[in-house]
Amino acid sequence: MAKGFKLKELLSHQKEIEKAEKLENDLKKKKSQELKKEEPTIVTASNLKKLEKKEKKADVKKEVAADTEEYQSQALSKKEKRKLKKELKKMQEQDATEAQKHMSGDEDESGDDREEEEEEEEEEEGRLDLEKLAKSDSESEDDSESENDSEEDEDVVAKEESEEKEEQEEEQDVPLSDVEFDSDADVVPHHKLTVNNTKAMKHALERVQLPWKKHSFQEHQSVTSETNTDEHIKDIYDDTERELAFYKQSLDAVLVARDELKRLKVPFKRPLDYFAEMVKSDEHMDKIKGKLIEEASDKKAREEARRQRQLKKFGKQVQNATLQKRQLEKRETLEKIKSLKNKRKHNEIDHSEFNVGVEEEVEGKRFDRGRPNGKRAAKNAKYGQGGMKRFKRKNDATSSADVSGFSSRKMKGKTNRPGKSRRARRF
């Protein structure tokens, strides 16, 4: 116990020492900060020069901003605007170079003075140029420009024109007929304006159309279907259905033409000695037929697979429902058992609690027992119905008088097969 007490004393003493050291350090920091604040600031000649330069730059920037505002308000050309932008860029570059020089240090004061004078002269020249540009009229632009500036301006203008053309081409709409429907496409399709001048088209058709009605069917041999084919097609994107509709239309037209040619007594069947090659060969038509059959079988298989998936989902739903029902029943029975146990402890059980419904369950499962089971009856007759087997095999008056199981046919045994000679005699 003594050792533990000493250790506690040492720890508390050490903590007190640390607190005292922290307080001393805080006081020292506060005093140093107060002394720094009270120290007088020493202003050198270099600091004054820097302040003057900063003030001059600020004034120049303000003047340039004012000039640019006036310039924008007046109707000046794009070339003058570009010149102003170039001069502003030069000013920014000069500011950056001056900042780098100040960071490196003031080594040569004489060199700095010269640079300052040169900068001041350049700034004054820039101011004069800006004032001239602001006061100049739009009519005297071509006279004041030099050849180099004009070439540069032409290049810039050409670039701007090319950019504008590209933007216009990008913004141009594309007709809806030329667009492939794609989710990633950025093009906005538009509908072309169409003029459905039916009168003019009918008039043109009358001028071009030959009077076939006046002539016989043999001369034109053209059949027009009375009904529209697309009316009978449910899905126009179904290749099989569409091909069947075309086939039916052509077959109807052939039958009409056949009747007309028969009426005119014109031979239309191919002679027996004439063999002409079809437009599409039999191999090609077999390929088309096979492709159509394959597509139809694939479609049927997809539908069957979809139906099986739906049945599987339904089966899973039924299974889940039955499992949930079982879980609920189990939970209810467990809760009943638990409540009965609790009531048994406190002797609060009534006779109604034991009304489980066993008799109803048995009555529900009871089946018709009017007809005896034949298999069971035969076994009982052979082996007995259980119980004591002693003295069962001994005869009495009733058993000896019972002749129901006797058969003379069975006593005789099985009849032997006759020989070959007897069998031959039969036939």
Swiss-Prot record:
Keyword Ubl conjugation annotated: yes
Chain positions covered by the region annotation Disordered: 29-190, 361-427
Record key words, sorted: Coiled coil, Nucleus, Phosphoprotein, Ribosome biogenesis, Ubl conjugation
Compositionally biased residues, Polar residues: 397-407
Coiled-coil intervals, chain numbering: 45-174, 234-265, 291-348
Entry-annotated residues carrying Phosphoserine: S104, S177, S183
Gene Ontology MF terms in the entry: identical protein binding; mRNA binding
Family matches, as Pfam families: Ebp2
Major site of localization recorded for this protein: nucleus
GO cellular component labels: nuclear periphery; nucleolus; preribosome, large subunit precursor
InterPro entries reported in the protein's UniProt record: Ebp2 (IPR008610)
Its biological purpose: Required for the processing of the 27S pre-rRNA. Probably involved in the step of the processing of the 27 SA precursor into the 27 SB intermediate.
Protein's name according to its UniProt entry: rRNA-processing protein EBP2
Species of provenance: Saccharomyces cerevisiae (strain ATCC 204508 / S288c) (Baker's yeast)
Gene: EBP2
